[in-house]
């Protein structure tokens, strides 16, 4: 505990928690303070000006991060016939239909993303209580229920991430690793912000992007000056 406290104290001394840093300075600071023995993830928290309790102000979607996520993603696809062959050719790790559903019911969930062709939803629908709590349930809003299963597989492999505002109107998303360059993290950050702006509900009034901060897995939040992102 003493070692952890000493580490956090050292990080806190480098970060002025009352200051808003230009984006690249913030990312560089987060990288510098990511001193754990593993490659920490770099995470973004965006406080949105929405009333998340209202269905017409829900914010949810997906975006392909141009510099990737730094993570190897295993993709499972529910499809049959030509769609199954297309998914396999696109690089899906697991392809199946009712047989895949049975594997999942048996507790074999060895994938990070699940994709389904529309006709497969009659099978996938039975798995809601298993996949839902794990954030793996295919959904058309994030592009994981689609007739273009091959395209969805390629996007997932290329670094697609999903985002969703929680009950407090906050979106949290990983945009890379501490080993990424600042330029790579900046590209990913701007792609996420662009996607969030495009997802702005028509019913949202006033300031939409209220506060943005970045942090590493074991670090503390660094506030971002939004004027540096325009």
From Swiss-Prot:
Signal peptide stretch: none
**May I have one GO cellular component term?**
cytosolic large ribosomal subunit
> Which UniProt keyword terms apply here?
Repressor, Ribonucleoprotein, Ribosomal protein, RNA-binding, rRNA-binding, Translation regulation, tRNA-binding
**Entry's Pfam families?**
Ribosomal_L1
Q: Which GO terms describe its molecular function?
A: rRNA binding; structural constituent of ribosome; tRNA binding
Query: Keyword Metal-binding on this protein?
Result: no
Q: Could you name the domain of life of the organism this protein comes from? A: Bacteria
According to its UniProt entry, one GO biological process term is: translation
Subunit field text: Part of the 50S ribosomal subunit.
What does the protein in this record do? Binds directly to 23S rRNA. The L1 stalk is quite mobile in the ribosome, and is involved in E site tRNA release. Protein L1 is also a translational repressor protein, it controls the translation of the L11 operon by binding to its mRNA.
The similarity comment for this entry is: Belongs to the universal ribosomal protein uL1 family.
Q: Please report the name of this protein according to its UniProt entry.
A: Large ribosomal subunit protein uL1
This chain's source organism reads Nitrosospira multiformis (strain ATCC 25196 / NCIMB 11849 / C 71)
Gene coding for it: rplA
